[in-house]
Amino acid sequence: MRRIQSIARSPIAIALFMSLAVAGCASKKNLPNNAGDLGLGAGAATPGSSQDFTVNVGDRIFFDLDSSLIRADAQQTLSKQAQWLQRYPQYSITIEGHADERGTREYNLALGQRRAAATRDFLASRGVPTNRMRTISYGNERPVAVCDADTCWSQNRRAVTVLNGAGR
């Protein structure tokens, strides 16, 4: 018993305990809502490049739980995407639909497809030709965040617009 008490009082044990306690209290950083919020700033990319699209326009939108309805914040991002795609017609796009880990594989694949289709339909309504767009669903197979909390799940409920090079 005395050995345990002497170890507990040693400066090394106290320092180790304090460093573990401080590390356990690390705060979480807020993640960006879309790629345009990555802090790289407007104008950091060559106009018309895929980096320009990702940084200055935003390549992803997010959805509410079990929903494929385009939210108001997503409508703004998609409107900017449509304008950019009309300005640079050499690009075609693939719209990836994603879901969080909750639900069956089949349900999440179907939900991801509905999200990709809703995104495609919105862009088409803003003048992007449908022959320049294709959709694919990854369901819950490609999460960007992995944890058992809504902070992660909400990042995985998304549609990502991927640029394909000219002539594709």
UniProtKB/Swiss-Prot annotation:
The keyword Signal applies. Part of the Tol-Pal system, which plays a role in outer membrane invagination during cell division and is important for maintaining outer membrane integrity. It comes from the Bacteria. InterPro entries: Bact_OuterMem_StrucFunc, OMP_bac, OmpA-like, OMPA-like_CS, OmpA-like_sf, Pal, Pal_lipo_C. A lipid is attached at residue 25 (S-diacylglycerol cysteine). Belongs to the Pal lipoprotein family. GO terms for biological process: cell division. Keywords: Cell cycle, Cell division, Cell outer membrane, Lipoprotein, Membrane, Palmitate, Signal. Residues 51-167 form the OmpA-like domain. NCBIfam families: Pal_lipo (TIGR02802). The N-terminus is blocked. This is Peptidoglycan-associated lipoprotein. GO terms for cellular component: cell outer membrane. Its main location: membrane. A lipid is attached at residue 25 (N-palmitoyl cysteine). The Tol-Pal system is composed of five core proteins: the inner membrane proteins TolA, TolQ and TolR, the periplasmic protein TolB and the outer membrane protein Pal. They form a network linking the inner and outer membranes and the peptidoglycan layer. It is found in: Cell outer membrane. The keyword Repressor does not apply. CDD domains: OmpA_C-like. It is a lipid-anchor. Residues 1-24 form the signal peptide.
